[in-house]
Amino acid sequence: MKSIQQTRNEFFRLMADNGFESTGSADYDGNVIFAREWTRTCQVVWYGECASTYRVTARISFGTPLIQLYENGRLLGQRDYSSPKRAMNAIREIVRCAGYAF
Protein backbone atom coordinates (compact mmCIF):
# COMPACT_ATOMS: atom_id res chain seq x y z
CA MET A 1 0.00 0.00 0.00
CA LYS A 2 1.32 3.43 -0.96
CA SER A 3 1.69 6.28 1.47
CA ILE A 4 -0.21 9.52 0.97
CA GLN A 5 3.04 11.25 -0.07
CA GLN A 6 3.81 8.58 -2.70
CA THR A 7 0.28 8.87 -4.08
CA ARG A 8 0.59 12.67 -4.12
CA ASN A 9 3.90 12.49 -6.03
CA GLU A 10 2.41 10.06 -8.56
CA PHE A 11 -0.59 12.38 -9.02
CA PHE A 12 1.65 15.42 -9.64
CA ARG A 13 3.72 13.45 -12.18
CA LEU A 14 0.62 12.23 -14.04
CA MET A 15 -0.83 15.75 -14.16
CA ALA A 16 2.39 17.16 -15.62
CA ASP A 17 2.75 14.29 -18.13
CA ASN A 18 -0.80 14.79 -19.44
CA GLY A 19 -0.79 18.55 -19.99
CA PHE A 20 -2.50 19.71 -16.79
CA GLU A 21 -1.20 22.94 -15.30
CA SER A 22 -1.41 24.36 -11.82
CA THR A 23 -4.08 27.06 -11.56
CA GLY A 24 -2.07 28.91 -8.94
CA SER A 25 -4.86 28.46 -6.42
CA ALA A 26 -5.51 25.93 -3.69
CA ASP A 27 -8.55 24.34 -2.09
CA TYR A 28 -9.56 24.82 1.55
CA ASP A 29 -6.87 22.34 2.72
CA GLY A 30 -4.08 23.99 0.73
CA ASN A 31 -3.97 21.31 -1.98
CA VAL A 32 -2.78 22.42 -5.42
CA ILE A 33 -5.51 22.52 -8.09
CA PHE A 34 -4.61 21.44 -11.63
CA ALA A 35 -6.71 22.21 -14.71
CA ARG A 36 -6.85 21.54 -18.43
CA GLU A 37 -9.30 22.87 -21.01
CA TRP A 38 -10.34 21.57 -24.42
CA THR A 39 -12.03 23.68 -27.09
CA ARG A 40 -13.81 22.70 -30.29
CA THR A 41 -15.80 24.57 -32.89
CA CYS A 42 -18.75 23.27 -34.86
CA GLN A 43 -21.20 24.57 -37.43
CA VAL A 44 -24.71 25.24 -36.15
CA VAL A 45 -27.53 25.62 -38.68
CA TRP A 46 -28.89 29.19 -38.91
CA TYR A 47 -26.26 30.39 -36.44
CA GLY A 48 -22.84 29.67 -37.89
CA GLU A 49 -19.74 28.62 -36.04
CA CYS A 50 -20.09 27.86 -32.34
CA ALA A 51 -17.31 27.19 -29.81
CA SER A 52 -17.61 24.73 -26.94
CA THR A 53 -15.23 24.21 -24.04
CA TYR A 54 -14.69 21.31 -21.67
CA ARG A 55 -12.63 21.88 -18.52
CA VAL A 56 -11.36 19.40 -15.98
CA THR A 57 -9.94 20.46 -12.61
CA ALA A 58 -8.17 17.96 -10.41
CA ARG A 59 -6.69 17.89 -6.95
CA ILE A 60 -5.64 15.26 -4.44
CA SER A 61 -6.91 15.25 -0.88
CA PHE A 62 -5.58 12.76 1.67
CA GLY A 63 -4.45 10.42 -1.12
CA THR A 64 -7.77 10.53 -2.99
CA PRO A 65 -7.86 12.19 -6.43
CA LEU A 66 -10.89 14.47 -6.88
CA ILE A 67 -11.93 15.82 -10.27
CA GLN A 68 -14.53 18.36 -11.32
CA LEU A 69 -15.97 18.53 -14.83
CA TYR A 70 -17.18 21.73 -16.51
CA GLU A 71 -18.81 22.16 -19.91
CA ASN A 72 -19.05 25.72 -21.23
CA GLY A 73 -18.39 27.01 -17.72
CA ARG A 74 -21.17 24.96 -16.10
CA LEU A 75 -20.27 22.41 -13.43
CA LEU A 76 -21.29 18.91 -14.52
CA GLY A 77 -20.20 17.06 -11.40
CA GLN A 78 -17.43 15.97 -9.08
CA ARG A 79 -15.93 12.51 -8.85
CA ASP A 80 -13.32 10.77 -6.73
CA TYR A 81 -11.12 7.79 -7.58
CA SER A 82 -9.08 5.25 -5.65
CA SER A 83 -5.76 6.04 -7.37
CA PRO A 84 -4.20 8.72 -9.59
CA LYS A 85 -3.88 6.26 -12.48
CA ARG A 86 -7.59 5.37 -12.35
CA ALA A 87 -8.45 9.07 -12.23
CA MET A 88 -6.35 9.80 -15.33
CA ASN A 89 -7.86 6.86 -17.24
CA ALA A 90 -11.34 8.08 -16.30
CA ILE A 91 -10.52 11.65 -17.38
CA ARG A 92 -9.32 10.39 -20.76
CA GLU A 93 -12.49 8.37 -21.28
CA ILE A 94 -14.79 11.19 -20.11
CA VAL A 95 -13.14 13.70 -22.45
CA ARG A 96 -13.29 11.23 -25.36
CA CYS A 97 -17.00 10.49 -24.77
CA ALA A 98 -17.70 14.24 -24.61
CA GLY A 99 -16.33 14.53 -28.17
CA TYR A 100 -12.95 16.15 -27.52
CA ALA A 101 -9.49 14.87 -28.44
CA PHE A 102 -7.24 14.25 -25.45
Name each model feature, range by range.
Residues S3, N31, R55, E93-I94:
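Detector for intrinsically disordered, low-structure N-terminal pre-sequences
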Residues Q43-A90:
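Intrinsically disordered, low-complexity regulatory segments enriched in Ser/Thr/Pro
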Residues M1-G48, Q78, A101:
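Negatively charged, low-complexity tracts enriched in Asp/Glu with abundant Ser/Thr
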Residues T7-E10, L14, A87-C97:
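Charge-rich, solvent-exposed alpha-helical interaction surfaces
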Residues E37, I60, N89-R92, Y100:
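Short stretches within intrinsically disordered, low-complexity N-terminal or propeptide regions
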Residues I33, V45, T57, V95-R96:
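N-terminal non-cleavable signal-anchor helices
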